[in-house]
Amino acid sequence: VLSPTDKTNVKAAWSKVGSHAGEYGAEALERMFLGFPTTKTYFPHFDLSHGSAQVQAHGKKVGDALTQAVGHLDDLPGALSALSDLHAYKLRVDPVNFKLLSHCLLVTLALHHPDDFTPAIHASLDKFLSNVSTVLTSKYR
């Protein structure tokens, strides 16, 4: 559960992401594909090369979903229900991949905003991404 301080930290951090959410999403995906090559199996039809249009487009979807989640911190299950259905029932993504992408998102955010990425912000973002991952995998059960 996100505390009031966590919610404030997440909103503050995400406000700095702003219009870069899609870029950061794509960068995190590229980082995940490089660091955890088994994640590529869910994207056999994608050109996974650096800067590919498909990775950029999916990165925008990731960024948009996280922006939506930040706007609904008090109702993540409601905000992400359709996305949870998609990943559980249609795409059947291994739940561990959400944790891997979360890690890569944290690294990406830290690289782009090193002065703002304090231990408190890091902890709050980690909790937020963990909550998002939990919601996205909740329908697997």
Curated annotation (Swiss-Prot):
Keywords: Acetylation, Heme, Iron, Metal-binding, Oxygen transport, Phosphoprotein, Transport. The keyword Transport applies. It holds the Pfam family Globin. O2 binds at H58. The modification N6-succinyllysine is found at K7, K11, K16, K40. The modification Phosphothreonine is found at T8, T108, T134, T137. The modification Phosphoserine is found at S3, S49, S102, S124, S138. InterPro entries: Globin, Globin-like_sf, Globin/Proto, Hemoglobin_a-typ, Hemoglobin_oxygen_transport, Hemoglobin_pi. GO terms for biological process: hydrogen peroxide catabolic process. One of its GO terms (molecular function) is oxygen carrier activity. Red blood cells. The modification Phosphotyrosine is found at Y24. Disulfide bonds: none annotated. GO terms for cellular component: blood microparticle; haptoglobin-hemoglobin complex; hemoglobin complex. Heterotetramer of two alpha chains and two beta chains. Belongs to the globin family. This is Hemoglobin subunit alpha-1/2.
